[in-house]
Regions:
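Short secondary-structure boundary/capping segments
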Residues: 1-2, 26-27, 56-57, 92, ...
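Flexible hinge/capping segments at coil-to-helix
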Residues: 2-37
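Residues that form or flank phosphate/diphosphate-binding pockets in enzymes
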Residues: 20, 45, 129
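Secondary-structure junction motif
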Residues: 34-53
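Hydrophobic hinge/microswitch elements
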Residues: 58-104, 110, 119-121
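C-terminal effector-binding regulatory domain of bacterial HTH transcription factors
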Residues: 92-93, 97, 106-148
Length: 148
């Protein structure tokens, strides 16, 4: 069952965007430095999905740095190293104080694809009353915390 949807933000420092331009559509990302997050289990970079009018596009962004530490990516982006994709709850303090600026903001029809988080059990019979209570507790606490 779906536990939560994690909104994402594509962002970079104002200085980086002033020097390199602000992308308006996914194809504009090709000339930018990408700060990519990778899966710790197999090293694959996470895809940068964008949505517009019900269509999904994977942005092609050349990586200048790939790591599995989202806080490091936020710090690198704030220092002007490139454009990154951050969970909104990670990006929010940087956006609020101006260290980062959203790339695909309200003035564009493109939106970063959210990540869906699921609660899984191996068999329906394993979804006992205690497990259901845990699921409901997590759903009530996590979903609002991840909305920004």
């Amino acid at each position: 069952r779906q536990l939560a949807r994690v909104p994402f933000v594509f962002c970079a420092s104002p200085a980086y965007l002033k020097a390199h331009g602000t992308p308006q559509q996914p194809s504009d990302l090709g000339g930018h430095r990408g700060l990519l997050h990778r899966f710790p289990t197999d090293g694959r970079p996470l895809r940068w999905g964008l949505l517009k009018d019900g269509q999904r596009v994977d942005a092609a962004l050349p990586p200048s740095m790939v790591c599995d530490d989202i806080d490091a990516l936020a710090t690198l982006a704030a220092a002007g190293a490139g454009i990154t994709r951050l969970a909104a709850f990670v990006a929010e303090p940087y956006l609020r104080d101006g260290r980062l600026q959203a790339v695909f903001g309200a003035d564009t029809a493109w939106r970063p694809e959210p990540m869906e988080v699921y609660f899984c059990v191996s068999d329906r019979r394993d979804f006992t009353a205690k497990i259901r209570a845990l699921f409901e507790h997590l759903q009530a606490g996590i979903a609002p915390a991840w909305r920004v």
